[in-house]
């Protein structure tokens, strides 16, 4: 995301997507697909609304955000979990939407969506 014309890295609060950019590890199962889906949802130039929970940044200085696509209000964090592109990830004290994320993750897991139907053990989303 760009704020004031400068890039500022972010993390979607409350969700855990498979890792794809750790230089010391191979990409995790379904990581490329989750990244492609996110890029499809948010092509360069997409207007978004960012909201935060309790904390503004994580220990890596990334913005912790709930992200909505401005044109239609799509709640991207929830979309990622509901489609099986990510798992829910409680990050206290930033838990305003955690109940919704946990329910969406449970449904995606039960239905075998996304990473849950691709990465083997239904209780182990990535790795």
What are the functions of these language-model segments?
Residues 1-127:
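Small beta-barrel nucleic-acid-binding modules, primarily SNase/OB-fold domains
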């Amino acid at each position: 995301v760009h704020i004031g014309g400068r890039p500022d890295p972010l993390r979607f609060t409350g969700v855990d997507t498979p890792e794809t950019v750790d230089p010391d590890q191979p990409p995790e199962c379904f990581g490329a697909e989750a990244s492609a889906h996110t890029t499809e949802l948010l092509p360069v130039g997409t207007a978004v609304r960012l909201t935060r929970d309790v904390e503004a940044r994580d220990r890596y200085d990334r913005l912790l955000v709930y992200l909505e696509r401005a044109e239609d209000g799509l709640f991207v964090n929830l979309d990622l979990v509901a489609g099986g592109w990510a798992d829910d990830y409680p990050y206290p004290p930033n838990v305003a939407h955690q109940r919704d994320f946990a329910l969406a993750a449970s449904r995606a897991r039960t239905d075998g969506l996304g990473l849950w139907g691709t990465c083997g053990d239904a209780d182990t989303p990535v790795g």
